[in-house]
Amino acid sequence: MTTSTTGVVVQGTGGVWEVYTEQGERFSASMRGRLKHEAHGALKLAVGDRVTIARDAQHAETWAITDIHPRTSKLARRMPGGRYGERIVVANLDQVLVVFAAARPDPHPRMLDRFLVIAEANGLSARIVINKADLVSPEVSAALFADQMAAGYPVHHTSIHTGEGLEALRDEVEHRSSALSGPSGVGKSSLMNALFPGLDLRTAAVSDAVNKGRHTTVGAMLHPLPHGGFIADTPGLREVGLWGIEAGQVASCFPEFRPLLSACRFADCIHTVEPGCAVREAVEAGDVSPGRYESYVKLRDELMGRS
């Protein structure tokens, strides 16, 4: 009888964590002893963490988490509601798929920039998924997201109704650990169901009154994929707070800014009012999007406490 095994935390509720093992089994486990004590301090178990679990010698059906393996990455954001602190959304990711809708709800490119900066700040590669692509023309969709495409982000146009883009996106997700992130109502759960029908995730319609989706995912859940890899459906976020990044680091989270930073006249240039700023000169020359620059200024001001 196996007494211990390793696996990945795929869900957590009320101190009980569901662990998916390397053998493809699922067990419910809780933290005990040292780990339980440390969980009230700096150590926070998260969905996506790799753990070792052991069977209780007295109760064969009871499992305990005995070790949390070192993380390779994490997707973290500020605690919601104005509280100070970090909330780890998912651990050990390879990439983030930032999902926005072409319409219903209307996309907000500046909000998209915020999601992209969070991925960059966490050292994660990001892909943009423009869902509900059948609701607008390709020309309209391209214009809405032109700034981010020009910044070099891979962009996928998808539709669960026409099947557009699903196969190509599936190829980029299989055998990797990915998280779908984005605002409410953009169709993340429906998209995951279309990519991998066996997941059977709950979905909800978009409210015509507010043009915002109702939350259907109540916490991050990691789903094993049929041919290897995991995909996480994260809750729809109305409030996305930056965490783990200083104001002076925001510029480096814009890929199109990075080649310019060393060309500024002053080493401590903050790219707002200084003479000889290569970033501002690129904006004026049309080489950097004014909209993306606006996002930079707003996010930097937010971290400086000026927003």
From Swiss-Prot:
Keyword set, alphabetical order: Cytoplasm, GTP-binding, Hydrolase, Metal-binding, Nucleotide-binding, Ribosome biogenesis, RNA-binding, rRNA-binding, Zinc
Entry EC no(s): 3.6.1.-
Positions with a binding annotation for GTP: N131, K132, A133, D134, G182, P183, S184, G185, V186, G187, K188, S189, S190
Top-level EC class as recorded in UniProt: hydrolase
Keyword presence, ATP-binding: no
SUPFAM superfamilies noted in UniProt: Nucleic acid-binding proteins (SSF50249), P-loop containing nucleoside triphosphate hydrolases (SSF52540)
Residues of the CP-type G domain: 82-240
One Pfam short name: RsgA_GTPase
CDD domains membership: YjeQ_EngC (cd01854)
UniProt cross-references to PROSITE patterns, sorted A to Z: ENGC_GTPASE, G_CP
Subcellular location: Cytoplasm
Principal location listed in the UniProt entry: cytoplasm
GO CC terms: cytoplasm
Cofactor: Zn(2+)
One record GO biological process: ribosomal small subunit biogenesis
GO molecular function, one term: metal ion binding
HAMAP family listed in its UniProt record: GTPase_RsgA (MF_01820)
Described purpose of this protein according to its UniProt entry: One of several proteins that assist in the late maturation steps of the functional core of the 30S ribosomal subunit. Helps release RbfA from mature subunits. May play a role in the assembly of ribosomal proteins into the subunit. Circularly permuted GTPase that catalyzes slow GTP hydrolysis, GTPase activity is stimulated by the 30S ribosomal subunit.
Subunit-structure text: Monomer. Associates with 30S ribosomal subunit, binds 16S rRNA.
Entry similarity comment: Belongs to the TRAFAC class YlqF/YawG GTPase family. RsgA subfamily.
Protein's name in the database: Small ribosomal subunit biogenesis GTPase RsgA
Organism: Gemmatimonas aurantiaca (strain DSM 14586 / JCM 11422 / NBRC 100505 / T-27)
